Amino acid sequence: MPSLDDILKPVAEAVKNGKKVTFFNGAGISTGAGIPDFRSPDTGLYANLAKLNLPFAEAVFDIDFFKEDPKPFYTLAEELYPGNFAPTKFHHFIKLLQDQGSLKRVYTQNIDTLERLAGVEDKYIVEAHGSFASNHCVDCHKEMTTETLKTYMKDKKIPSCQHCEGYVKPDIVFFGEGLPVKFFDLWEDDCEDVEVAIVAGTSLTVFPFASLPGEVNKKCLRVLVNKEKVGTFKHEPRKSDIIALHDCDIVAEKLCTLLGLDDKLNEVYEKEKIKYSKAETKETKMHEIEDKLKEEAHLKEDKHTTKVDKKEKQNDANDKELEQLIDKLKI
């Protein structure tokens, strides 16, 4: 059985020879960041939605259900919102290919924006299923700024449109909605020009994204990085296909080693870990301060209530004494 190095050498050689890489990413590239994928039996996102009391798991991303009850989505969004997670080594690997001019495009099913956080430029990214980068009202389609939406979420409120009071949601593509125009326009341009296709961390079950790896030209070197064979790699394999049934981050590490980028990968990854660790510590401290302020406010309120109660009791006593005095005077 060939080693992972042997499996990946042709990929590294293609990149060294000037071939550009197009990525087709799924949730599996972000599980190393702590974000659950969607369909794993025990750890997947859909497997952990029982607490939301949904009629069916996918309802959390169903546009008709959202219009009736957006609360389950926003309960989930608190956990998935960008800034809660740091990019993985795979995301940084993509950025390193961009830096050396070896990146063609990144087609991603993910809504976590970790490619952006790793520093991949917008012109390379096609978020097939949308993202948290912008937000609109589902009724009048007016835009809401990300800062405003975050304020609603922080206050545990459902974001509502300031124009028509309709529900606002991030521009994530829900079931029942069309994919972004950018997805179709760029794929029409890119389709015949894909030289190296790295398909990573995706089950290739959601169309039309799932059809993309099968549409690349016959000269394209297709690479699958996944836990199992999926899509056309399984049903319509090509002789030149490279199959790496390994963790996405491990494959990223190996490819960086073969390309002489391992030192850069480790450097940027450690630097980002420290940055996000500091940010997390700062956020934790902010939460602690907020909790302390709330506690102090409650204590003040309780003291004030106690004072008011005492004053009211004293007033009641005074009223009774006055009533008794009036009664005596009447006699």
From Swiss-Prot:
Record-linked PROSITE patterns: SIRTUIN
Record GO terms (molecular function): histone deacetylase activity, NAD-dependent; metal ion binding; NAD+ binding
Binding site for Zn(2+): 137, 140, 161, 164
Deacetylase sirtuin-type domain residues: 1-262
Top-rank EC class of the record's enzyme: transferase
Family: Belongs to the sirtuin family. Class I subfamily.
Protein name, as recorded: NAD-dependent protein deacetylase HST2
Protein source organism: Candida albicans (strain SC5314 / ATCC MYA-2876)
Organism lineage string: Eukaryota, Fungi, Dikarya, Ascomycota, Saccharomycotina
Gene: HST2
